[in-house]
Amino acid sequence: MTSNVMNALDKIKDLPLFKEELYFTGGTALSYYINHRISEDIDIISAKELEYKKIIPSMLSIDAKKIEDENVFALRLAGLFPDEYVLKFILDGVKIEFFYANRATQKEILKTSSFKYYKGANLKILDVKTISKLKIVALLQREKSRDLFDFGAMLEHQIVSVEEILPIAEGSKNIKSKEELLKFLEAKKEAKEDEAVYLDEANRLDLSFEEIKKRVVLQLKV
C-alpha cells in the first residue's frame, strides 16, 4: 500500500457507515495480507444494494469528492439506478470505490466469507481467501494487468488451489478444466487504458501485460 492509501484508510476506517455490511476487498486488501505489489485504490464491497443515502454524505463529510463511474450509462440503459450499484470517490488523490456484489458467483463467495476489523476500527477487511476468490471473478470479467498479477500472487502464496478456482471459473465463464483456464488466460489481451503494476513505491518499474501473463501461465502449469 502507498502512504496515500494508508492515510485514506485511516480517514475512513472509523466512519459509522462501516458498521453496515461493507467490506474492504480488492488488490489493496490483498496487498495488506501478502504485500505483493503497490496498490493505489480502495475497494469496498457490499452484499446488498448500496445504501447511497448513507454512503454519499458520509464520504463528503471527510472531504471526499464523488466522481462518475464509466458504467453509469449502461446501468441506466438497463433500467437500474447507478448509485445502488457503484459509487466512486477521490480522497486525497486515492480512488475509493463502493460496489454491490450483484453477480451470483460473488454472492456465493460472500456467503462463506469471514472478516476482521482493520486496525480495530469499524472498517472490516475480508479474509484473504475470500478476497482472492473475488479477484478471480474480476479476472474472468475484464482485461487488467493488476488482476493477472494478483492471480499469479495467489498461486505463488498458495492461497487458492486449482480445485477452488475451477468452480468460480465455471460459474463465470463455463470453464471446466485447468486446460480451458490456461487457454482463456493465454487469449487475454491488454486493455487500451490499462493500469500499470508496480512492485515498489520508490522505484516504479512498470511490468508489461505480456510479461505478467507469461509468468501466470507458467505458474498455473506447474
Which residues fall in each region the model found?
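Compositionally biased terminal segments of proteins
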Residues: 1-222
